[in-house]
Amino acid sequence: LIQLDEGNFGAAMLIRGSKVIGSDLRSSEITPQSAFERFQQNRRRILTGVVTTGVGAFFASRIPGFLEPETTVHAQALPAAPSKYTTSENQTPFAKATHYNNFYEFGTEKDDPAKNAHTLRTRPWTIHVTGMVKKPQTLDIDTLLKYRSIESRIYRHRCVEAWSMVIPWDGYSLSELINLCEPLPSAKYVQFFTLVDRKQMPDLPGGYDWPYTEGLRLDEAMHPLALLTFGCYGQVLPNQNGAPIRVVMPWKYGFKNAKSIVRINFTDKQPRTTWNEINSREYGFYSNVNPHVDHPRWSQAHERRIDSSTFPRTIPTQMFNGYDEVASLYSGMDLKKYY
């Protein structure tokens, strides 16, 4: 089986200088999008021969994104300035990050969202901000896109299922939107609501209390790392990755990152969240990445990193996913109890 390195596509539109703050990854080391697209075409021709063999077909069918169509390579560009939030770790290739997803509204298999999310209509799109705020808002997605400058942040992404990626997300701090709405002193939590529409989500599974909801403490949502996200890899978000607007909390497990948001509500009580309500023993409200607190059914001490390697590597999981700057948010808390 031929191993093909897809490189670090996506960052070329995001990193302009010779070196970004806090990183040893130079722009000269990043594959330009045009080169990536040529590579994908060549890869297809090579793989056409490779996977006709029994061994090639067997392995290729089991590697995330290996033979998936690059349906979003030509998506609308989203210019983003470089930021200090980056990493020298190898990025997950675009094809893998967009074809190995959890988005149950479009199916429960990892490749279902990429197959089914084309039915999602992202224009027009409105976000309602409600609850304990001085200035409730009804905001159009394009208004939000222009509200602040978009920046690129290359974050580690850790799923509760013990796999991980490194993804360049594009957006601005969630605190910018929160400050616009001016929460009341009594507001302590933020709740996010994902779109639910059976016409756009014909594969919406039963057995769940839709819409999908997630929540954060207000101080968590205000942390500079919390990202209101509109794109990835220098493009608008693909539908399967939570278009047109989602949040990214890099120190938490991935299910805390609400996708396709239509409402944000401020409250004084810990809000209902979907997975915590389904099984609070397995999915805590906080769900911070913690290698010392196992999921009841598997260890969280290690993770399978999905990157440009043919097969995922197993690496140790870091506390808070390596984002130690959030530790002060949980000072004095028993993180085995408040998981």
Language model features by range: what are they?
Residues 17-18, 29, 48, 54, ...:
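Iron-sulfur (Fe-S) cluster-binding modules
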Residues 33-55, 247:
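N-terminal secretory signal peptides and thylakoid transit peptides that target proteins
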Residues 76-339:
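Structured, non-membrane catalytic/scaffold regions adjacent to prosthetic-group chemistry
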